[in-house]
């Protein structure tokens, strides 16, 4: 073994296997592409994205960590969302007031 070397197992890693998913139709109504990262509280994403923000409360994109989805102007997408886990607290972005999602 080489110091720092990592040995990976075989096969694909399945993420969010037990998470309750919802599907959301999203359209970028702006004139520039918008990217949304894997752990962004989805209702707080760019205001140019048109979707049911109330239904998406407490959810994030169902994509691997450190990745993003790019929404091109005028293009409709259907995305899969999963609940934010852990403490379910969101600070920063546009949540007013910031803090726990379930309070």
Curated annotation (Swiss-Prot):
Q: What transmembrane ranges does the database entry give?
A: none
UniProt GO cellular component terms = urease complex
Annotated Gene Ontology MF terms? urease activity
The EC number(s) given in the record are 3.5.1.5
Q: Which InterPro entries match?
A: Urease_beta-like, Urease_betasu_sf, Urease_subunit
Keyword Hydrolase attributed: yes
Subunit field text: Heterotrimer of UreA (gamma), UreB (beta) and UreC (alpha) subunits. Three heterotrimers associate to form the active enzyme.
What's the protein here called?
Urease subunit beta
- Organism whose genome encodes this protein: Mycobacterium marinum (strain ATCC BAA-535 / M)
Top-down, what is the taxonomic lineage of the species of origin?
Bacteria, Bacillati, Actinomycetota, Actinomycetes, Mycobacteriales
Q: Which gene encodes it?
A: ureB
């Amino acid at each position: 073994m080489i110091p720092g070397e990592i040995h990976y197992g075989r096969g694909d890693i399945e993420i969010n296997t037990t998470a309750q998913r919802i599907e959301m139709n999203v359209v970028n109504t702006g004139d520039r592409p918008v990217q949304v990262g894997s752990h962004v509280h989805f209702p707080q994403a760019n205001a140019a994205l048109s979707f049911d923000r109330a239904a998406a409360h407490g959810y994030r994109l169902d994509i691997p960590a450190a990745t993003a989805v790019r929404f091109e102007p005028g293009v409709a997408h259907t995305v899969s969302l999963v609940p934010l886990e852990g403490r379910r607290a969101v600070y920063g972005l546009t949540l007013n007031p910031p803090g726990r999602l379930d309070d």
